[in-house]
Amino acid sequence: MARYMIKRFWAMAATILVITTLTFVLMKVIPGSPFNEERGTNEAVQKNLEAYYHLDDPLIFQYIFYLKSIITFDFGPSIKKPSDSVNDMLERGFPVSFELGMTAIVIAVISGLVLGVIAALRRNGFLDYAAMSLAVLGISIPNFILATLLIQQFAVNLKLFPAATWTSPIHMVLPTAALAVGPMAIIARLTRSSMVEVLTQDYIRTAKAKGLSPFKIIVKHALRNALMPVITVLGTLVASILTGSFVIEKIFAIPGMGKYFVESINQRDYPVIMGTTVFYSVILIIMLFLVDLAYGLLDPRIKLHKKG
């Protein structure tokens, strides 16, 4: 176990290094600087600003300064909002993004499992076709399109929910739904397929022959083994939810990290881009690691100390 943890730690560190390096390269291959579009800024002032933010240094020194800011987790002030530091933006935005993302994940997992189990137990019946039709529809519609439709129908037409901001629980309904539907549909399809296969296994028939209750057979024996494929893709789904929240936060004017990230790309605010990229990379890698551990704990055939 200790050897596995050490290997995973170095793998996580290497992954973060690759991601941050690619982010740095992509920022630098775009011609120009963040101050090119500033109106009324003369050349001397622009050069002073570039010197202040180390943008006129050789690339190797910029990269070293960039790595130093990552190691110390101090990304300095925003270029477009000098009075606001990147760390303060992360501190304000992360709780909002975390609340939105985790709520969507919980709803997606629970709803997807319920739909998948119902569809498997009523195989080739009305509930099966209805659940899988909803799943196909959920997979087919991108979350930003769904968000627009939800706003139009439930905020503009029916006026049941607010269309934007993030000040009370009722504001969470539409963005959470837009973010959770796609992953929920994927989980439902995987659960249904896996449950159908598990329910035909010999140990399920043995459990029925022993007189165990249907609830115990489904929950204790069938569902636990059917969860393996779901857990396998859960890390990817978590990543898609967290990164998908960028667009959702922008659409619903939610003051989370996604809002800052989208604005920083449009404004070429390098410190904010670096800070949000590194922060999200660390969160996603940790989530993938936890999913990997959960997979090993649920499947006794997997020995963590033998994994590479």
Curated annotation (Swiss-Prot):
Protein's membrane topology: Multi-pass membrane protein
Q: Which PROSITE patterns match?
A: ABC_TM1
Residues passing through the membrane, by range = 10-30, 59-79, 100-120, 131-151, 168-188, 228-248, 278-298
SUPFAM superfamilies per the UniProt record, alphabetical: MetI-like
Q: Which UniProt keywords apply?
A: Cell membrane, Membrane, Peptide transport, Protein transport, Sporulation, Transmembrane, Transmembrane helix, Transport
What is known about its induction?
A: Nutrient deficiency conditions, which also induce sporulation.
Entry GO MF terms: peptidoglycan peptide transmembrane transporter activity
Please give the InterPro entries that the UniProt record associates with this protein.
BPD_transp_1_N (IPR045621), MetI-like (IPR000515), MetI-like_sf (IPR035906)
Look up the record and report any one GO term of the cellular component aspect. Answer: plasma membrane
Subcellular location per the Swiss-Prot or TrEMBL entry = Cell membrane
Q: Name any Gene Ontology BP term.
A: sporulation resulting in formation of a cellular spore
Identify the residues that the record assigns to the ABC transmembrane type-1 domain, covering every copy. 94-295
Q: Please verify whether the record's keywords include Protein transport.
A: yes
Keyword set includes Mitochondrion: no
Family per similarity comment = Belongs to the binding-protein-dependent transport system permease family. OppBC subfamily.
Q: What does this protein do?
A: Probably part of the ABC transporter DppBCDE involved in dipeptide transport. Responsible for the translocation of the substrate across the membrane.
PANTHER family recorded: DIPEPTIDE TRANSPORT SYSTEM PERMEASE PROTEIN DPPB-RELATED
Q: Which protein, by its recorded name, is this?
A: Dipeptide transport system permease protein DppB
Q: In which organism is this protein found? A: Bacillus subtilis (strain 168)
